[in-house]
């Protein structure tokens, strides 16, 4: 079937028809760079990276743009806490973002526009909104007049009448006094003492968050794009306000397809699920999790649930994904062994039923849960035949095995699942010593001396060796991820 995408704007799945055949213009809202990324951020950018990878695999030329919000109240507060500048804070956490995403094998965007590098375009957009009556200056600020945009609420489904109750209570008195309507939002904020500011026709100040993205989309990709994506928490008010700003100026849709990924929840001490967020203080940074879990196992865990469904994270829930990744990685590392079988594979992998079923799953609104299930099933089949072969049962059809392995590797690549490089996995421990320790552990297990068996396992892990226990075959081992 043709690719179907759930469009938040229309609240239904629709056939994907890009503006220009064969090309996709895609914009993803990036992080506000004031802290390290948590697993919720990991989910967001793994999801959209996988969407991008799949579109590329289907022959589209994808231009993928993701911004950095590098001027914001949170960044200013962090700069004050750390006794440094807003610029230094932004650079620190942008570098940390790239380190984390590289470990999750998230491809680099084609460009990363920053708010501070888009000030002329932001100013021009605000000026245009003011000149056509959609915005007004007020005591050094500039506000967007929400009621002027007749279609406000079309993305989120929210109506102003429903939002009206309590709207004024959410505002500070001095801000409310400057607004013509409690719903209006800031496009430009007048300068405050000690804060960075830029010159403008309305006085020195800095832009509001929503206008930054409207300007960056317009500058990087044009007036209308194919896909605008982000976390579901951005649907309102951020994306709603982007639409109001951009479409008031152009009279054209900002994006043809709006896509939003669901939250990643954590299981709290009472067993209830709650959104992972910095404001709730329940978040786990990616770099902390990397100390405990292999990055690719985290990526696999995030792909096990389709992007529009929430994920409940706990250490217990993660264990199955870690084992899945160990098994998949073992198969991914068979390239050298396959070459040694002496029978090259044919190039015809698109005809493989595995590819067909994988594509059917991904064509159904990027259903990574179903697509990954196909990859895991294929990996288990290949692993079974490989283990039989190394224990004396020759492959019935080496060429077919090689072809299916290439199919497996291709599908893993589309999902962004990548085995660690061999040189990064090396341990100084001699292989003979590893096997000797495994034998001692096997003896301890036979004697039901679980404490000793666990001690040996941990000792090997500390030296970079991961043991993999199997139900019906001897324990195997692999080098740990870097």
Curated annotation (Swiss-Prot):
Find motif ('HIGH' region) and give its ranges: 31-41
InterPro entries per record: Cys-tRNA-ligase, Cys-tRNA-synt_Ia_DALR, Cys-tRNA/MSH_ligase, CysS_C, Rossmann-like_a/b/a_fold, tRNA-synt_1_cat_dom, tRNAsynth_Ia_anticodon-bd
User: Cofactor: bound how, per the entry note?
Assistant: Binds 1 zinc ion per subunit.
Q: What is this protein called?
A: Cysteine--tRNA ligase
Q: Where in the cell is it found?
A: Cytoplasm
Keyword DNA repair recorded:
no
Sorted alphabetically, the Gene Ontology BP terms of this entry are: cysteinyl-tRNA aminoacylation
What EC numbers are recorded for this enzyme? 6.1.1.16
The UniProt annotation places Zn(2+) binding at 29, 213, 238, 242
What species is given as this protein's source? Gloeobacter violaceus (strain ATCC 29082 / PCC 7421)
Query: Motif span ('KMSKS' region)?
Result: 275-279
Keyword set includes Plastid: no
- Tell me the gene name: cysS
